[in-house]
Structures are given as C-alpha cells and as structure tokens.
Amino acid sequence: MNTGFRGPSIPFRSIHRLIQSVLSQLNFSFYRHQIIRADFSGGQITGDAGLLPLRAFDQRHGLTRELAQHLRDPRRSGRVRHASLALLRQRVYQIVAGYEDANDADRLRHDPAFQLLADQPLGQPLSSQPTLSRWENTPSAREIVCAHDGGLDAFVRLCGKQVRQRREILLDVDSTDDPTYGQQQLSFFNGAYNQHMYHPLLIFERHTGCLLAARLRRGTASSHARIVPLLLRILRRLLREFPGVTIRLRADAGFALPLLYKFCEFFGIYYTIGIPANVVFRRRTAALQRRLARRYRRSHLPQRSFTSFRHRARTWPRLRRIVAKAEHSATGTNLRFLVTNCPGRSAQVFHFYNERGECENRIEEFKNGFHADRLSCHRFLANAFRLLLHTFAYNLVNWFRLHLPSALRSAQIETLRTQLFKIGARVRQTARCVRIHLASGWPFQSLFQIVAQLGDTS
C-alpha cells in the first residue's frame, strides 16, 4: 500500500562507504553517562603538529637545506620521486619526534604533519623504509666530513653572538660506548666495556650545549684515538671566527695524551685533563695523605685537601702542573690527579673539572633522548652517516631551545616533546591554505603561541 511517504534516498556509490562506516564503529560501555562510539572517519589527524615551529625555525635559518647541499645525490633526476632534501627532513624530524628507527617511516609516511615538515604535497606519501635505507648508504666519507663542517658553520652563525659576548669557548671532550648486536663493519669486542660496540668520539661546547663533533670509530679504538686531528679541524675554524676568545678544554683520564697537551699549548688552549695516578704522584702527595689520616683519626670526619706540583715525565719536553685531590674517610684514602696549564688555586681547578659532569647529561640526552646509538646498518659509512643525522637532530633542537623562553632553555628533549612537539591536530586543506586545527584542550597553548614566533619571517 502506498502511504505517500518517501524517505531520503542514498546514492548507490555511498552505500559501500556507509556499510564500512557502520562496521568499523567501535563501542565502549565503561562510560556511565552515555554510550561511546568511535570510528576512523576523523580525517587527516596527526599527533606531532607541535613540530611546525621547529620547522619554521629551520626554514628561517636554512639549516636542513644547508646540510643537504653537502650530500651528493647520484640518482637519475628523471626517476627521483623523493628529493634528497625531502629524505633528509623526513629522517631528521622523525628522530626529533622520537621515531628513531628507519622502519617507522612505513607508519609515518601518510602522516600529514610529516608531509608538511618534508615540504611534500598533502596526500602524497613520503618515502618508505627501503628508500631511506638506500639513501643512508649513499654518502661518501668526504661528504660526511663536509656535512659535519656544515654543522660547525651553523654554530658560528647561530651562536657566534653569544660566544663573542662571553669571550670563552669551553670544549668538553668524551667518548661513549655504542653496543652492537649484528654484523656491523668495524664493530669489535672492547674489553674495557665487555661488549661488542662502536666507540664514538664527542666534543660538546659547554655554554651553548652544541655538539660540535661526533665521529664514529671502530669498537677497539682507545678513548683518545683521533682526538688531535678532530680538534685541529674544529679549532682552525673557531680561531679564525673568534680571535681573542679564550678556549678551554676538559677531558677525563682517557685523554691523558702528551700529544694532546702539546697541541693545546701550541694553540694557546687552557686544558684540564684527568691523569692516572702513578708511583711518582703518590710519593709527591704522601705527606698530604698522612696529614689527612691524622685529622681523620682525631675528628672521625671525612677529610679533603688539594695541592699542586710541577712534574716532567720522561716523554714530556717540559714541566707541567699536576693538581692533586686527596680524600680520607672510613674507606681509606682516595687520590685524583689532573694535568693542567690553567692558573688558579688547586681547589678551583678541581671544581672547574668536576663541572664536566654536565657533559655526561648531554651524552645521556644524545643517546637516550635522540637514540643516537641506533647504528644498525651493515656498512660502517652508513652508520657514520646515521650518527651525523642524529647529531644534526640534536643540534637542531638545541639551537631552537636556545631561543626559547628561559624556563625551557635547559629542558631536555623529552620535556620538549611533552610540552611542545606532541600536539594532536586535524589537518584540512582548502583552495587557499592548509589549516591546522590544534587540540582545544592543549594545556600549553600560550607557550606554543610564543614559540611559534621564532620562525616568523613576516
């Protein structure tokens, strides 16, 4: 029977979409106020929209573009789908966001935020993991070294004003272990660490936190291996750019190398380097040890004292200052020695040396926050290039946070991800612009608005 009622018609082409929408709905019953229904029809959503100010900062100073200029692209231009610059940006910003594995590219290549960060048209997928892996195996040793030099250029450009105002550059030198678990080239067993590993060499600038150099070395390399050639490459640029600026260097006893002392003295660098105890040093401090032992027996309180003396080893061409710290407690006597050409009281020299603990914090952030130990390629050069990418990601964030409000200038990467980078947003493209609808309940909106001005060139 015809009732005269005619319901709304559904276009045939929409029936399949409607059925899929109904089938893909998820129901949750724990909420006592209403039924919860969820589906995957929200459109282009990202959880990393907070990286946009960092990308604007990068664009303003030409950082990724400058790095890409040092990397040759051997591919035929007519067959290139993903330019080298886009691959570089994709890989670097994934590292910054906490997606350190190349395999993560397969999950993120459709993410609208990363498409914007890589300057890729929205909706056009980014490169896959195999493409990134082939690209990582492309650079030569010369290109990697030149790219590291490009990072030094960026340091001079972005931090030069601070260096000239402070009139001091403080270099913290250290090495770190990078455990390996596969068949990586030049990965060897290191008895000191009791593991198969690489042994990277790192040089930080203390006042700015910048990583001026990171060199990958074979697993059996000593702590001080290649330190003088690496310092020479850095210092030639620093001395040329910052004449009259005092340069200081700190390192632990693994760098107690006479050639390094001579190098620093030749270039006028003030060095403070740990040096192992020996029979001569113990004999020169024997009276101090006995005096501290007597004080401890009288007071039963831990005792500490400092002294210094001049010493010339057989292989040294001159006398050098040795600073000693002696401690006596219930566990006995503890002796520490430094070799230095710095003036000042012995206690002040040791206090200056002990502040190099900040370098350990930087290394921890570099390895754990930026996952710089993910060097799982087979070829040594590919892993050296990966270390370069992680170094650049670290420095990009570090240069960025030097311009942040004072409360965040010392924040580590995990804090920056929580308070700035990890913001949920819906991305919508119109004929005129791309609109990013950030989460309305984001608790750091005012901070984000301030930070967003860092890359504003209007």
Give the residues covered by each predicted segment.
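Dynamic "connector" segments at or just before major functional cores
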Residues: 1-222, 228-241, 424-458
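Acidic/histidine-rich, metal-coordinating catalytic segments
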Residues: 174, 244-256
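Short amphipathic alpha-helical "interface-anchor" segments enriched in bulky aromatics
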Residues: 57, 346-389, 393-400
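An anionic, glycine-rich sequence signature occurring as long contiguous blocks
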Residues: 4, 24-40, 270-371, 452-458
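C-terminal, non-catalytic "cap/extension" segments appended to globular domains
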Residues: 378, 383-386, 390, 397-458
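Short, surface-exposed basic-aromatic patches at helix termini and helix-loop junctions that form
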Residues: 261-270
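A short acidic (Asp/Glu
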Residues: 182, 257-262, 282-286
